[in-house]
Amino acid sequence: MVEGADERRRVGRLVLAGLPIGNLEDAPPRLLHALREARVIAAEDTRRLRQFASRADVRLGGESGARVVSYYDANESRRGDELLADLRRGEEVLVVTDAGMPGVSDPGYRLAAACAEEGIPVTAIPGPSAVTTALVVSGLPTDRFCFEGFPPRKGLRSYLEELAGERRTMVFFESPHRIAATLEAMATAFGTDRRAAVCRELTKTFEEVRRGGLAELAEWASEGVRGEISVVVEGARPRAESTSDTDLIAAVGALEDEGVRRKEAIVRVAKETGVPKRRVYDLVHGVVEAE
């Protein structure tokens, strides 16, 4: 039993800490204390971490100093193995990103999963997140939501069509040079009047939240949008009880009679009824039987 206790004491601990997403005053005291006490810090961008520490008047690692290493998408696998080795030797490893919580659209979850598998303790110092911040200021339902990260550059249309029937509020990240095209694609896939909010520069001096239908927002964004951007989109409306499987098939057929291609007709019916596109597709093509 003594050997087991000694072994447990030699195991390190992984600490995932959230940094402010724009406002230095959002840095919690626990974060500043952890940065001063840390011996090993894995940062998405070491230069930006040192800039943050300087602004916050924090000496990384205190008098003894900390070993600060980079930990980002390109080196996540290799660096993760190195950090795991540190943890096995009993080191406490502090992981931070440029802004927000590690593991949320940033490296962290794979290392946390590896630690959990090996029985290495994992804890967090909660901090700001652009995901939940955008959600709560959007004015859209917050009881059920999903985070989609950055939409893919390739296959955007099919990706969004698959999400057309998602009933939960959706949160996305997007870059300034792609936001207008993405909103336009969302308007096509989800419907021009689907409510959304574009949240820009959250917690910063020029914070802005623009609300409206997707088509309206796409037109606004076409004039140019700058800064860090989060997009919140309301979920699909629940399927009306009167919309039976037979009604869905008939609706697609009616659109085809009007000259609409079947693929587009399926997308439209799914969008209008809130039924997942895959379900409408399977019904129309006889993959599943109508109920």
Task: State the predicted function of each range.
Residues 69-78, 150-152:
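Conserved helicase motor
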Residues 73-87, 107:
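Short phosphate-binding loop-to-helix
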Residues 35-41, 119-123, 169-170:
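Short active-site oxyanion
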Residues 109-166:
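Class I SAM-dependent methyltransferase SAM-binding "motif I" and its flanking Rossmann-like core
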Residues 86-133, 176-181:
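A glycine-rich beta-strand to alpha-helix segment
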Residues 2-7, 11, 67, 91-92, ...:
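A contiguous loop/helix-start segment that scaffolds small-molecule binding in enzyme catalytic cores
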Residues 1-72:
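Glycine-rich, flexible N-terminal cofactor/catalytic loop recognition
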Residues 13-17, 89-97, 145, 168-172, ...:
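Generic beta-sheet signal
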